[in-house]
Amino acid sequence: MSRLTPELVHQAVINASRKHMCKNEVIEFLQDKENEYSVYRQLLKGESIDVEYRYKEVVSVNGKKRIVAISSFRSRVIMHTLMLLIKKEYAARLSDDCYNCIKGRGINASRKRYDPVRQIKRIIGRYRPWGYLQLDIRKCYESTRPEVLFACHEAIWKDKRILRYLQRVSFCDIGLPIGTPSSPMNQHIMMMAFDRFIRQDLKIRHYVRYADDIILFGDKDKLHEAKWRIANYLWYNLGYELKKDAHPTPMRNGTDILGYVFHCGYTRVRKSIKERMKRSWRNPRSRSSYLGILKGA
């Protein structure tokens, strides 16, 4: 915990309050500087932390139901503080092939290498692969096993206090909590060895992972072999199960991922997104979001 400073906790407060400044709980926390110092003292002294969640079911625009875990703002500040404390080792181990919830990476990222859409276009346009293998982990957050994640933590960090705090904030009653700042980080930590397995063991040159959505490009035989080796690796090493409908597919059928359908020479926005775009275009907030999608195409 030698990196813990009041300035680091202050930065954690800034990070935690982004996009939440209008909430009463956040306003009350920010009005009293003592709240910030109490978090610093609590972590400095190694005092126990308890994170309580309330749960809310949300339905995404494509009809998918999720249970979101909502914690207090103070708990989110603690999570962001821990994330800053472990940032150096975490960032050093991240693969260049993962793109979600990482600063400087994602759709429309300023650097082409860290934009998954432009990366997929580059792979298809430059290397002309026979086809692709698109994989999705079944209930990734819910099926994450604590003992596996904590073993991954222990392989990276040796500070017992940090490890104990990570154990306290990483899980809720239903697995990795959807909606907390620490969960995407933990999911990447779970998949770090998998990313190396794809590159070093399977020798897959063209690979993109966005959270638990995985796509590999190559020839038919290599993709068939990769499917079964990946399924075995995920199950026996991480306790994850793939959805059953994955199979190598030729590029002429198009690649439907990340809201786009990729073809050799051109890219289209997914049909369901175009239909939602037509219905929501008059809403200025929705329009700006959809303009970002159109920019990617």
Tell me what each language-model feature is:
Residues Q42-K64, V77, K158-S170:
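Reverse-transcriptase-like RNA-dependent polymerase core
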Residues M1-S38:
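Non-catalytic, polymerase-adjacent accessory regions of viral genome-replication enzymes
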Residues L44, S71, R76, H80, ...:
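Right-hand nucleic-acid polymerase module
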Residues N15-I27, V58-A69, D96:
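Glycine-/proline-rich flexible loop or hinge segments
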Residues M83-R145:
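Active-site-proximal segment of RNA-dependent polymerases
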Residues K65-S95, D173-D201:
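Conserved pre-motif C helix in the palm subdomain of viral-like polymerases
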Residues E36, L43, R118-A211, I215-I230, ...:
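Conserved polymerase palm-domain catalytic core
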